[in-house]
């Protein structure tokens, strides 16, 4: 989990992981979500520091190839080296993920939405696994409202964002917690998870391939 305090520790983190033989690493970002009303990464210098953090990790990994792989770098690099582009994600496609709580209440889209209570939507339970089929859940007014807003938000991303093929329209929970609605586009979470990572990876690949002076 990366917070603002971690952004000055790229060398320490690389040395720790490589020194302990941990060669596959993935970072989760501190997000504005649920009880965490504000991420420390939202500070004014957060994006600059995060980019510098990623650039330093890229440099260290390039100096010692094979010692450590970073999930975030691998994901962007694999898309950049192929013709594949994302059209959506499991977290904005209905029933790609099915979430069931201890009472049998069923939600879909982001797992983070299960059991959440909100003023605008109530909770995000669409029915009960013991009483309803998925087809019945999909026919409820609440599900149709959430699906319509998530789909509209994905389309906003598709039409306005040059990173869409790397992101697939983002995660509904991030949009809701940051903007109060699913029907919106860019989030701070996407800036950190996709956009800034893509900028660093593509710049690093171009340099390694001799495509820049």
Regions found by a protein language model. Give the residues of each.
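Flexible mid-to-C-terminal extensions adjoining Fe-S/redox cofactors in radical SAM and related proteins
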Residues: 116-213
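Radical SAM enzyme [4Fe-4S]-AdoMet core and its adjacent flexible, acidic
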Residues: 1-106, 111-129
């Amino acid at each position: 989990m990366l917070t603002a305090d971690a952004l000055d520790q790229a060398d320490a983190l690389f040395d720790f992981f490589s020194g302990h033989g941990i060669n596959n690493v993935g970072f989760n970002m501190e997000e504005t979500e649920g009880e965490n009303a504000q991420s420390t990464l939202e500070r004014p210098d957060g994006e600059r520091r995060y980019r510098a953090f990623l650039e330093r990790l890229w440099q260290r990994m390039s100096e010692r190839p094979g010692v450590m792989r970073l999930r975030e770098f691998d994901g962007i690099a694999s898309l950049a080296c192929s013709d594949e582009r994302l059209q959506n994600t499991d977290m904005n496609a209905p029933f790609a993920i099915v979430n069931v709580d201890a009472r049998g209440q069923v939600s879909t889209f982001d797992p983070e939405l299960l059991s959440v209570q909100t003023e605008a939507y109530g909770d995000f339970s669409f029915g009960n696994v013991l009483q309803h089929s998925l087809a019945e859940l999909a026919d409820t007014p609440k599900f149709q409202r959430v699906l319509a807003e998530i789909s509209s938000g994905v389309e906003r991303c598709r039409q306005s964002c040059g990173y869409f093929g790397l992101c697939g329209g983002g995660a509904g929970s991030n949009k809701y917690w940051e903007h109060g609605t699913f029907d919106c586009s860019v989030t701070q979470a996407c800036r950190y998870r996709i956009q800034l990572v893509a900028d660093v990876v593509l710049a690093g690949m171009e340099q390694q391939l001799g495509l820049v002076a």
